[in-house]
Amino acid sequence: MMRCLAARVHYKTLIVICALLSLLTVLLWNKCTSEKALRFLPRHPQPPPSPKIDSHPQQPQPPEPPPVVGGVRYEEIDCLINDDATIKGRREGSEVYMPFSWMEKYFEVYGKVVQYDGYDRFEFSHSYSKVYAQREQYHPNGVFMSFEGYNVEVRDRVKCISGVEGVPLSTQWGPQGYFYAIQIAQYGLSHYSKNLTERPPHVEVYDTAEERDSRSSAWTVPKGCSLTRVYDKTRATSVRQFSAPENSEGVSLPLGNTKDFIISFDLKFTSNGSVSVILETTEKGPPFVIHYVTTTQLILLKDRDITYGIGPRTTWTTVTRDLLTDLRKGIGLSNTKAVKATKTMPRRVVKLVVHGTGTIDNITISTTSHMAAFYAASDWLVRNQDERGGWPIMVTRKLGEGFRALEPGWYSAMAQGQAMSTLVRAYLMTKDDTYLKAALRATGPFKLPSEQHGVKAVFMNKYDWYEEYPTIPSSFVLNGFIYSLIGLFDLAQTAGEKLGRDAGQLYSKGMESLKVMLPLYDTGSGTIYDLRHFILGTAPNLARWDYHTTHINQLQLLGTIDNSPIFRDSVKRWKSYLKGGRAKHN
């Protein structure tokens, strides 16, 4: 019977049955393998069930652990300051950190975040002023202290450099502006010192009529104007003679300098006139024009025209102007004590334009002209010294409560001393006795007490002192006194034993006082500006860090001409105060 059944089943049917059995076997095998693999896969947390009205209230969560920064846990903490105020600090383990924004005000310290090679670093300093290294023994013909680093003309309390006088006009105690002998002497001494320490300037000559091959073809002479080469007997040289009506375009010379901005020219007018310099600047829009006119106008700004009066100039004179300073003082002109800050810079000196009738020669542009500024200051001191030998300061000065105000016309020992230092150097450079005689006359106010329009004070009825501010009662300002001593030293050394006897005696008496009184200015962590706390019984007038470093620089200088230990020891101790050093306590 089986054989009959097998015979009846077609062989194709057997093939289909075998295929179905094979497929079923494969499917069962894959299912088992997948379930086994799923048991080893990471399981994601199930989403929380949707909240329901009847769900149980949640239990309060435990507080979050402290944040972790750089692997260190920290937490905020209240810091109680002197039982007066509370600020937020940070605790990391046993350390407590307080914000620097609070520390810098509380301790009067300084710091900032700076970046080096792509990473940030916080730089902290106890003070903000630096001490200059004394290069060598001080000499009256050498660098004056650290004045090669001074830039008097850029100070915001300098209104401008006068076109008539060639020296700075100060606004420190009055927005109207006044000539201040200290500022003028510092202007001269800084440029003198720069001349000794800087490389010689690059000078480019644009026109000099003396050269035989010099041609006027570079000049532009519009219709109605003239320009000729003539011989000037007073100068024994050829010059350019020009004539250009005020309503004309003017006779012009292209310059095109993009690197240097000190312009100089020899000039003589026979009528009213002007020399104008066109400047392209970093400011968008038309160029600025600086006009140097034959008036006594100090400075004027109108739109993009800046005007400086340079006086009549009816005899040959050399005009030297710093175009950068003149531009920025003009743009920043204000009616307040401070010149407004500006970022505008000159890019190119385009051309020079003359109007009026006169002669011009030796037009140059240079990197610097330090000696021109030095002699401008020296000559101003000679011209403006009065019959007493002083340089009166024509502005009221109020030093503080308890001191009688100084009315216009007062003298300053610091002004007298720094003027001496300037004039002595001018004499040593030129051998012109005019400068030395003016310096010798400047000792006059040192011999008279403050009550008699002098600068002399006496401490404890014994020690002579020369007052920067000859107040009543005396104030005993330290830095001004030392500057006066340096000036007396310069004069005594230069004038010699006979002519310099008065200066030498004044210097010796002053140095004796300084050595005795210097410890009175030491607080154990800084220095004191004056002795008002002793004279008036008020709080001490602590010296700012820039005055503190001035005291150090002055003592370093004196230490090269007097080897008294008090100068060396004071310098060492006072330098330590700049980095947080303090005198020992009991």
UniProtKB/Swiss-Prot annotation:
Disruption phenotype: Double morpholino knockdown of both glcea and glceb results in dorsalized embryos, with reduced ventral tail fin, kinked tail and an enlarged heart cavity. In severe cases there is significant shortening of the body and tail coiling. Epimerase activity is reduced. Expression of the dorsalizing factor chordin is expanded, whereas expression of bmp2b is reduced, notably in the tail. Expression of gata1 in blood islets is also reduced. It catalyses: [heparosan-N-sulfate](n) = [heparan-N-sulfate](n). Changing residue 178 to F: Moderately reduces catalytic activity. Keywords: Calcium, Golgi apparatus, Isomerase, Membrane, Metal-binding, Signal-anchor, Transmembrane, Transmembrane helix. Residues 30-586 are lumenal. Coiled coil: none annotated. It holds the Pfam family Glce_b_sandwich. Its EC number is 5.1.3.17. It is an enzyme of class 5 (isomerase). One of its GO terms (cellular component) is Golgi membrane. Pathway: Glycan metabolism; heparan sulfate biosynthesis; Glycan metabolism; heparin biosynthesis. Residues 59-68 have a biased composition (Pro residues). Its main location: Golgi. InterPro entries: C5-epim_C (IPR010598), C5-epimerase (IPR039721). Substrate binds at residues 150, 155-157, 183, 398-401, 483, 532, 544-550, 568. It is a single-pass type II membrane protein. Inhibited by O-sulfated heparin, which is produced by a downstream step in the heparin biosynthesis pathway. Residues 40-68 are annotated as: Disordered. It comes from the Eukaryota. Ca(2+) binds at residues 208, 210, 237, 361. Changing residue 155 to A: Moderately reduces catalytic activity. Belongs to the D-glucuronyl C5-epimerase family. This is D-glucuronyl C5-epimerase B. The gene is glceb.
